[in-house]
């Protein structure tokens, strides 16, 4: 086994270590009037969401997988009072706080929290204006005087339980992402501190993308197909310019990959990431949402003479994948068994967003019965979890997990 703290050279190698985030009070700060602002369509019931998430984590442990938690790793990264204060200041600077005195009050609130994990969880939950002391009239600035009725001094981060997106593990390296929306881009701060200051992961992991970049990329669009081949999605959340930056860094830093397949597909919320429509479940099998296949474009990207070489592939997708993975044949298993109604319904409920924990062993939501039956017909072993509340955030088992270590295949 590798001595590197991050070791992910496939989507299907036996999963040894994975990072999750247990949903917290950030979900209780969702409001109907501001769902779109926070990239939600509905409000999960926190108590049941936590039960479902705990069952997900236990299902992974039952398979011998070590489960890490984002909130604990971030807390462990605040290794000195100076780093703790720096974290608070950086968090405040990125929180879009309106009002000078409001920022002072929030700083005092956060500095008064002595336990590091409690501090981290508070930054995730957001800050309601009602939690802060009333600002004296004489101390109010213009912003304080004209501020709207918006109830939050700092927005919550309700998408955090989708740990796949703020950063992505690629080989022994990490892509610390710049995300599509401001409300999610703040999530990458935790990854920054983990990979800079954590006793195990800090300073020991190569970054192949950095959150300070000005173009957007998210982990749901970054798939590690093999030790030689990556797949990336050009999607609603990830643009082509970011992919080019990422790939140049991967090739220049000799992270270990020889080719990238870039998938361009529909730019909309229901297909927000590549992994919502396409995931690898075995050496020679993938799930796919049939609706994307007609308009899908695939580009092969290599690195020659210090520059990217890009070729659009015109052939059959299954044949292209088989050729690049070195297998005789690839089977594309359609979400919803190809039925238009079932496919649309089950893709919306993340029927294509599977987490493979070993070749042919896949974690899925139990609700996607048509797709699950098809996967079982192809010989896959399914670990079914309930997700009636978790799915309201529009993400499945792959979205909710970030592998830190897999066995090689």
Swiss-Prot record:
GO MF terms, alphabetically ordered: arginine deiminase activity
Family to which this protein belongs: Belongs to the arginine deiminase family.
EC nos: 3.5.3.6
The protein, known as: Arginine deiminase
Organism: Streptococcus gordonii (strain Challis / ATCC 35105 / BCRC 15272 / CH1 / DL1 / V288)
Metabolic or biological pathway: Amino-acid degradation; L-arginine degradation via ADI pathway; carbamoyl phosphate from L-arginine: step 1/2
Chief localization: cytoplasm
Gene Ontology CC annotations of this record: cytoplasm
Reactions that this protein is recorded to catalyse: L-arginine + H2O = L-citrulline + NH4(+)
Gene this protein is translated from: arcA
Superkingdom of source: Bacteria
GO BP field: arginine catabolic process to ornithine; arginine deiminase pathway
Induction remarks: Expression of arcA is significantly higher in cells that have entered stationary phase than in exponential-phase cells. Up-regulated by low pH and by arginine. Repressed by the CcpA protein. Part of the arc operon, that consists of the arcABCDT genes.
